């Protein structure tokens, strides 16, 4: 019988602070490989819950078919030692120093396999699955948080004839952290808990010392974020004439039946030396169900996303997709305030727009198909249809599709089957993704991927990376797309991308000009 791996989890109450960016500034600003996840209620905009991954024991990074595991401390070295034998059976393992870091090269997936065989094959998702399964018996589930990039999908779909230009941006296909210290905050009850995960018997004293240090620092929160002046000049990779040209060219592919709907996008870039302050401003301006700040060694990613990517609850095995498609700008008056009458008129216009309805229903149908691929027969249903959610600059049509995951599959199988979400690609999905690469001619990096977490009891909660900034070398890249169908107006689609990028651009510009 296999020995149960050692794990000791301590949990202690810590002082509650409503301002999670101040906590992050105090505990994590100097730590790469840290993550902040916030959530707010859609209607009231009140804060709900927050998770702060303060420091990690192991970093797991995927690029192409290679997954690299790096121990960030002695606690993490024990994890690597224990998972190495399992991973060596799934792929080719290589390392300079096995104690600190090793890589696993997985065989490329055979695209001729049927759907179920693809899901059962060893893939790069096993990099996360092996760790999660290793600690599945832990009474307190271990926590893996991070990013799935959009371009992870290129390992799973035919890419013949697609050539992408180097845009100077580097982003792994996925980057996840195995939490060593994690704060969970319930804003409704105003309670906070620090959980510390020790994976090595020899490191229990050291892990306890770190936890004590964190608890002490929480008594003196530093909410002052330093701000540097910066330009608020915005550039884009496709100006309006070029972008409307892409929309027109894609319309040909809709006409000939290659796709019914597709989501071209473009990127807006500006200086962003004040990432945490910009995130705090975005939270203030545009509270959303999924807000995130990821401090990676290679990049910083922050955003306020309205849209769940994939959500899975192991207690009832419910899988959920929350398609958002169809939008209108909010109804502002001449002074920049919401005019309720104009806002209501724009909502009515959105609800009655046949193009928006058609686009939305196509994507609900695509979500139903995605759910059906991995769920038990007869369990799929549309739980909510065409509701309206409001955000600071934009309103959306939303629906919710659910199903019961098949017993032999887990949430990572479901993500593999469903990526990338139809609201960021189109339908049919694989052809739409191939056309997107063909016309955009570059990687999307984090945009359209997913950020969130996986726990060792199987829970999975991710949002689509939209309304977000990917920051590298001091430059923020904000990408936004538009849902194109046969009767789309190219200029209106270009305008839609600006509306969607507006909240993040505004937050960064507000901070950049504050210090002047």
Predicted segments with their positions:
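Extended alpha-helical targeting/anchoring segments
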Residues: 1-516
């Amino acid at each position: 019988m296999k020995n149960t791996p050692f794990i000791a989890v301590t949990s202690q109450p810590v002082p509650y602070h409503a301002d999670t960016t101040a906590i992050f500034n105090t505990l994590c600003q100097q730590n790469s490989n840290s993550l902040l996840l916030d959530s707010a209620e859609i209607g009231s905009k009140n804060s709900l819950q927050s998770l702060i991954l303060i420091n990690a024991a192991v970093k797991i990074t995927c690029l192409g078919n290679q997954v690299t595991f790096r121990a960030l401390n002695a606690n993490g070295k024990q994890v690597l030692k224990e998972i190495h034998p399992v991973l060596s059976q799934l792929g080719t393992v290589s390392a300079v120093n096995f104690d600190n870091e090793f890589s696993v090269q997985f065989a490329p997936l055979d695209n001729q396999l049927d759907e179920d065989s693809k899901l059962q094959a060893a893939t790069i998702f096993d990099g996360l699955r092996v760790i999660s399964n290793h600690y599945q018996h832990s009474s307190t589930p271990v926590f893996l948080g991070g990013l799935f990039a959009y371009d992870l999908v290129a390992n799973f779909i035919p890419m013949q004839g697609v050539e992408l230009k180097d845009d100077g941006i580097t982003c792994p296909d996925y980057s996840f952290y195995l939490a060593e210290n994690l704060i969970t905050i319930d804003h409704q009850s105003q309670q906070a808990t620090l959980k510390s995960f020790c994976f090595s018997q020899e490191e229990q004293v050291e892990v306890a010392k770190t936890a004590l240090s964190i608890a002490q620092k929480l008594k003196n929160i530093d909410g002052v974020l330093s701000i540097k002046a910066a330009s608020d000049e915005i550039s884009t990779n496709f100006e309006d004439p070029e972008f409307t040209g892409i929309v027109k060219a894609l319309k040909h592919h809709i006409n000939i039946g290659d796709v019914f709907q597709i989501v071209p996008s473009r990127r807006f870039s500006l200086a962003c030396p004040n990432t945490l302050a910009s995130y705090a401003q975005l939270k203030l301006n545009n509270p959303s169900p999924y807000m995130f700040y990821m401090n990676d060694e290679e990049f910083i990613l922050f955003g306020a996303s309205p849209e769940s990517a994939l959500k899975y609850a192991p207690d009832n095995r419910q899988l959920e997709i929350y398609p958002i498609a169809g939008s209108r700008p909010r109804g502002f008056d001449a002074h920049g305030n919401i005019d309720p009458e104009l806002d209501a008129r724009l909502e009515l216009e959105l609800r009655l727009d046949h193009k928006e309805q058609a686009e939305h229903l196509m994507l609900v149908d695509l979500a139903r198909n995605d759910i059906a691929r991995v769920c038990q027969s007869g369990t799929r249903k549309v739980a909510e249809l065409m509701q309206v959610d409001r955000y600071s600059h934009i309103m959306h049509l939303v629906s919710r599709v659910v199903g019961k995951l098949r017993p032999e599959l887990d949430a990572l199988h479901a993500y593999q089957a469903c990526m990338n979400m139809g609201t960021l690609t189109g339908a049919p999905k694989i052809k739409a993704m191939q056309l997107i690469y063909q016309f955009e001619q570059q990687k999307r990096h984090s945009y359209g991927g997913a950020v969130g977490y996986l726990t060792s009891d199987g829970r999975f909660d991710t949002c689509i990376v939209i309304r977000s900034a990917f920051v590298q070398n001091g430059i923020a890249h904000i990408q936004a797309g538009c849902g194109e169908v046969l009767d789309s107006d190219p200029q209106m689609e270009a305008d839609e991308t600006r509306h969607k990028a507006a909240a993040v651009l505004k937050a960064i510009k507000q901070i950049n000009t504050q210090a002047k």
